[in-house]
Structure formats: C-alpha cells, structure tokens
C-alpha cells in the first residue's frame, strides 16, 4: 500500500466546443467531462491502474465533489482519505476547440 499526499487537489473540467471560441459571446458546449486531479491523486490512479494498492490523502470537506469524483473512477486498489477542511477543491477548466487549441483556466 502506497499513500500519496495531494496538498492542492482539483476537479479538472474539460469542455469541448463545436466551433471556435467566440470571445465576448455566448458559446455552447459540445461535451463536458470532470475528473479528479492533483499530482498525488494522479500518482495514486496510475499505481492502482498498475495493480498496486494506493490511497490518496487529500484535504477536502466531507461533501466536496472531489471525493465523489475519485470514488466514481471505480479503480480496484484506489482509496481516498480526506483530511477535513473548510471549502471545496479548486476547479481547473480546459476549453478545447475543434482545431485542437486548448485554453486552460486554473483557479489558484
């Protein structure tokens, strides 16, 4: 069992646009995916995918969507333990246009 520490976890949200990004206008989304992120979470995912049991230790409130996102991965051998904190994990958003151009918007 390996325990990873993720002091700054995130929810990584990727949205795809059906056309080019129109700055200053309303843009409709083609699709949206949300995955847990942060270096420790990512390492724990890779370990679990490789057959090694891993626990990601993250600062998160008990109702933080990050915890549900990690659990929803359904990876055997991947566990998550939360250290209670106030507030929610940051959300990083990537906007991908049809030509492959990606714009990232990361919370501090």
Identify what each model region corresponds to.
Residues 23, 49-108:
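Conserved N-terminal subdomain of the carbohydrate kinase-like
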Residues 1-55:
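Glycine-rich phosphate/adenosyl-contacting loop at the front of the ribokinase-like
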């Amino acid at each position: 069992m390996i325990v990873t520490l993720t002091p700054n976890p995130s929810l990584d949200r990727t949205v795809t646009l059906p056309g080019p990004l129109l700055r200053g206008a309303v843009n409709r989304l083609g699709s949206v995916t949300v995955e847990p992120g942060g270096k420790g979470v990512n390492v724990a995912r890779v370990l679990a995918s490789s057959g090694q049991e891993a626990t990601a230790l993250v600062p998160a409130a008990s109702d933080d969507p990050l915890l549900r996102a990690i659990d929803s991965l359904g990876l055997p051998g991947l566990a998550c333990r939360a250290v209670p904190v106030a507030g929610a994990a940051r959300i990083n958003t990537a906007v991908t246009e049809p030509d492959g151009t990606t714009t990232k918007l990361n919370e501090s």
